[in-house]
Amino acid sequence: MRNHVSRYLTALIAVGCAATTAACTSLPSNSEPQALRSFEASASEEPQGPVEDQEPDLLLRDFYEANNNPQQRYSLARRYLTHRASQSWNPAPETLVLDGIEINSAADSSTKNRRYDVRGLIVGSIGEGGEYRPRNERYSTTIGLEKVDGQWRISTLPDQIVVQRNELWNHYRQKQVYFFDTSGTTLVADRRWIFQEKMGHNDNHESALLSLILTGPSKSLAPGVVNEVPSGAAYAGYHDDYYQFTGLSSLDEDSLKRLTAQSVWTLALAEVPGPYRFKFDGATMKSPINGSEDLTVDDFAEYNPLPQQAVDSGLYAFNSNGVKKLNQGVATPTTGTLGNTHNIESMAVSAKTGATAAVRTAVEGDAKTSTLMLGPIGGQFVDVLKARRLTSPSFELSSSSLWVVKDSDQVVRLSRSSENEGIVETVVDTSELGSLGKNISALQLSRSGVRAAFIVDGSVYTATVARPNPGQRKLVNVQEIIPSLANVAQSLAWQPNGSLIIGTSKPDAPVWIVAQDGSLGSKLSAGNIVAPVMNVAASQSTLYISDARAALELPNSDTSTTYWREVQGLEGSRSVLVVPR
């Protein structure tokens, strides 16, 4: 019954997440990990326990290698401990991710007892359910070893799992679990780190994903999404061709439909073969379209979390000569207000409706002023907001509202009034930003509108968009997404796959791609780029930047290319590219 039928699975693999047939488990967890996906056994050079007569420093390094395997409460790692240490060791649920592990012998070591100072830079941590959080702090501890029957074993150690970043990528995979935003209309990706197990069972992949849905969203995302699953709900396994759940009797019909849609899209985008059948407390879920028990993403197409490019949404560019539309290397000036405006500083276009927002600048006396105007491409625009400085506007998914930062310290949301067709301005609550809210130079909403990325004093942060009350918005769970780029970030944009493209002032690393959760930051080729990179944009196929001299592009499929190509139709001019989104 599980025929893999979906036209939606041809795009959007997350940064650094290659397709794999490995089995996986979500980590860390206080319970026994669940296997994700069968794996064909192969020879492994990884240590399976202490090597006889191994030197203590080498044994300690192998112990940290064994930290990557959480099965049976880290039973492999416990083999490196003395019996007493193994009995008392109780690792915390949080796993620390270090850039590297430095091991040095302590001064008070002896022939029978050794002590080692272990240091490193903490770049992130993985919490329960596999949520990654970026960090930037030093790690330091001391490990004691003693001889047991002539063999070195670890006798004293902290209750903490520590892994190296490169080993994280070798032993874990990233999977997306989907939850609805607070409106109940948009699915939002929740990225989790999953342990890649070397042995598994046929249905473990689905089991882990569906269990994560029932467990609920990650802590950082939770304020921006809804979790309608009651606390007593459980996944009962795959039996008689059905995924079976219990404890859902309190949910109404609409809630059950949303849970089914979550499950279908999570399984489908994890490449679990469909169609899918579900039983909730013994009741069979059926297609809302044709009543079939065999469900696919087509039955819930209205919740498709993948970006849908509108017909003729196009590609635009602007410079001192106004706005142009690009088509197959030809730049054609637009008509209306934009075609005649020569002082545009930033611009955004909704791929869904074609609604357009642009910021134009002017010098009045000794002061610069910025004006936000709204209208359709090719039509007449109206002024809606004026300030000393305005960041590039960013539309919400519906395009009926947009965000902009006013004078670097006030985030405002502009919405069309349902009563009089006017524009309503509300201030976004940024109280959790503290001092970070005083000098915001860029802010962009993710496609779903549940996340915001912004730049403060050259550092990049993300936050979750909460809705405390109707019409209100608040930025919560603020975190610096990539501390290594502190003080150099100039521009940012969300890619269709949920990662960020960031332009910087660093000549040797002017453009970066950063994973949604900050777990990976990859610098792209500096090639022929002249920093700083003041504008960035991304379509499903191409990355665009504007450096100090020109508009350049690079295929998304080949980011290893050394040189960026000047955008055809814009040669010889410094232009800014605008991708409708």
Curated annotation (Swiss-Prot):
| Keywords assigned by UniProt, alphabetized | Cell membrane, Lipoprotein, Membrane, Palmitate, Signal
Membrane topology term: Lipid-anchor
One Pfam family hit: Germane
Kindly report the protein's main subcellular placement as a broad class: membrane
Lipid-modified sites (S-diacylglycerol cysteine): C24
Lipidation positions, renumbered (N-palmitoyl cysteine): C24
According to the UniProt record, one GO cellular component term is: plasma membrane
Read off the PROSITE patterns from this record.
Answer: PROKAR_LIPOPROTEIN
Q: Quick check: keyword Nuclease in the entry? A: no
Signal peptide interval: 1-23
Q: Where in the cell is it found?
A: Cell membrane
**Family annotation (InterPro entries):** GerMN, Lipoprotein_LpqB, Lipoprotein_LpqB_C
In terms of HAMAP family, this protein maps to: LpqB_lipoprot
The family note in this entry says: Belongs to the LpqB lipoprotein family.
Classification via NCBIfam families: PRK13616.1
Q: What is this protein called?
A: Lipoprotein LpqB
Q: Which organism is it from?
A: Corynebacterium diphtheriae (strain ATCC 700971 / NCTC 13129 / Biotype gravis)
